[in-house]
């Protein structure tokens, strides 16, 4: 597995990052909570100008890598747009399917459903894609862009397994970007905040927390890269992507918990970016399934198909 990204993809990520910073970075997400129309007024035109929504994550290596890194850049500012949902749709279906949601069981609301025309929802338990009809906005403190939904008939022509794998992969890169920003905020605070005449990062408790969150982030980045490599080779199975999801959730819990501890009360203030990042991550961390339910799905997948890793596990049913 190559551990470095194609240079063209890295250059594209830099352009995407500059564009999102010009929109205000995390402030755009904060503003969009107060006025949902800012998603279409500001985020969508920027994405179209970059040509990002038209890229194909199943395309050639440079294009696919550019998608992953651009989604990571979007996550770094918790961009208020369903980018992973849109890009998880194969290029040949985008005229008929506007986005992909992942669900587990019955749902009554989904994030950004009001923006996605002719979206589908894939049930992880049944492996079936169904049409989504969006209703009125139903925001909640930890689900700021939710809308009510009704799931309809099965969507013909959608390869549920394929779009599920890509959506999980894109989610992981989006979360990686958000966690990288959270980690940077914590590290900067530990370096700059003075206590008893020295930076708080010199104290053992803070150093341990910074080490823990850095290790969790590095582990997620490495696993996301490996999962992308497996998908590119056509070797990824459901257990691989579910393992990535479980790692994503656990890494987020570690980075956010330790980040808040490093920041103290400041990190809980509404005006601080860490609070916004934490809040905007909750929908992807809990939908379609949280840590316990995702681990259960992973266990069932391993039982059915085995798992190739450092210590391979054979299927047993």
Residues covered by each model-derived region:
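Amphipathic, small/basic residue-rich leader segments at the start of a protein or domain
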Residues: 1-77, 302-317
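FAD-binding core of flavoproteins
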Residues: 76-184, 188, 308-317
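Glycine-rich phosphate/cofactor-binding loops in nucleotide/flavin-utilizing enzymes
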Residues: 1-2, 266-317
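Long, well-ordered alpha-helical segments
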Residues: 12, 16-22, 126-127, 145-158, ...
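Charged, glycine-rich active-site and insertion segments that engage polyanionic ligands
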Residues: 236-267
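Alpha-helical transition-metal enzyme core signature, strongest for iron centers
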Residues: 176-183, 210-213, 217-220, 224, ...
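Hydrophobic packing residues in well-ordered alpha-helices of helical domains and bundles
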Residues: 9, 172, 203, 210-213, ...
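Glycine-rich cofactor-pocket loops
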Residues: 2-3, 28-37, 184-214, 225-240, ...
């Amino acid at each position: 597995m190559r551990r470095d990204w194609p240079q063209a993809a890295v250059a594209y990520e830099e352009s995407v990052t500059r564009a999102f910073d010009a929109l205000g970075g995390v402030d755009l997400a904060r503003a969009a909570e107060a006025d949902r129309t800012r998603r279409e007024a500001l985020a969508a035109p920027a994405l179209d100008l970059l040509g990002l929504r038209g890229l194909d994550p199943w395309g050639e290596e440079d294009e696919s890598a550019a998608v992953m890194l651009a989604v990571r850049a979007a996550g770094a500012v918790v961009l208020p747009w369903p980018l992973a949902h849109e890009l998880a749709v194969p290029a040949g279906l985008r005229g008929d399917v506007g986005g992909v949601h992942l669900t587990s069981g019955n749902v009554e609301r989904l994030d950004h459903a009001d923006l996605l025309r002719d979206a589908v929802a894939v049930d992880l338990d049944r492996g079936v894609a169904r049409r989504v009809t969006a209703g009125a906005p139903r925001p909640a403190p930890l689900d700021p862009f939710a809308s009510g939904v009704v799931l309809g008939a099965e969507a013909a022509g959608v390869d549920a397994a394929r779009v599920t794998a890509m959506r999980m992969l894109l989610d992981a890169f989006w979360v990686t970007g958000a966690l990288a920003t959270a980690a940077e905020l914590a590290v900067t605070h530990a370096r700059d905040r003075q206590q008893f005449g020295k930076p708080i990062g010199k104290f053992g408790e803070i150093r341990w927390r910074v080490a823990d969150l850095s290790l969790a982030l590095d582990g997620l980045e490495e696993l996301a890269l490996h999962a992308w490599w497996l998908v590119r080779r056509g070797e990824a199975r459901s257990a691989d992507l579910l393992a990535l999801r479980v790692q994503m959730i656990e890494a987020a819990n570690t980075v956010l918990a330790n980040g808040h501890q490093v920041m103290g009360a400041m990190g809980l203030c509404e005006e601080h970016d860490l609070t916004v990042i934490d809040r905007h991550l909750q929908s992807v961390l809990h939908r379609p399934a949280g840590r316990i339910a995702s681990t259960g799905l992973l266990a069932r997948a391993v039982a059915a198909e085995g798992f190739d890793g450092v210590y391979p596990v054979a299927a047993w049913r």
